[in-house]
A protein has these predicted regions:
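Short, well-structured N-terminal submotif of metal-dependent ribonuclease cores
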Residues: 1-36
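Acidic active-site catalytic centers that drive phospho-/nucleotidyl reactions
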Residues: 8, 97, 116
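Alpha-helix capping/helix-boundary segments
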Residues: 12, 39, 100, 118-119, ...
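Short, solvent-exposed loop/turn segments at secondary-structure junctions
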Residues: 15, 83-86, 121-122
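Short, glycine/charged-enriched secondary-structure capping and boundary segments
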Residues: 19-22, 27, 48-49, 126-129
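PIN-domain endoribonuclease scaffold, especially VapC-family toxins
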Residues: 28-29, 34-86
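Active-site neighborhoods of divalent-metal-dependent phosphate/nucleic-acid chemistry enzymes
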Residues: 72-111
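Acidic, PIN/NYN-like endoribonuclease modules and their adjacent C-terminal/linker elements
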Residues: 105-113, 117-141
Length: 141
């Protein structure tokens, strides 16, 4: 079975730049990987922030690597899920990630992969299958 899997920013960042469960997930061909415009914007900001002390060329290479990794992932435009912002706001108080949850509500993935614990509430877990990378890998093997 091919699962539709929404990837949060922290999963993308770890999967692109580090070896581990997240990078293994990005390499699984049998998954329909999806993320949101907001997650991608956050990813690009995080890459620039984490590498700000390195040379401009190193940052360019890291951003190019990011774009290459994103080429295999469906990126849902913000305009598609803005109507879900109010619903997301009722489920979560962590304002920064309300757009991410709105995208998840719109996309309705089989799994929502994240390392952010504020998504692992009973209220959110009733609506979407929230899971971390470590627990997700055994399910698809």
């Amino acid at each position: 079975m091919i699962y539709k899997v929404f990837l949060d920013t922290n999963i993308l960042l770890s999967g692109i730049f580090f070896d581990g469960n997240e990078s293994k997930i990005l390499d699984v061909v049998e998954l329909n990987l999806v993320t949101s415009e907001d997650a991608v914007d956050e990813l690009r900001r995080a890459v620039k922030k984490k590498l700000k002390y390195l040379t401009e060329r190193t940052i360019e290479i890291a951003l190019a690597e990011t774009e290459k990794a994103l080429s295999d992932i469906v990126i849902v435009p913000r305009a598609k899920y803005t109507h879900k912002l109010k619903e997301a706001e009722t489920l979560m108080k962590y304002k920064k990630d309300i757009p991410i949850l709105a995208a998840v509500l719109y996309i309705e993935p089989d799994y929502f992969l994240t390392g952010d614990m504020h998504f692992f509430t009973d209220q959110i877990k009733k609506i979407v299958n929230v899971i971390n990378a470590r627990d997700f890998l055994p399910r698809i093997k």
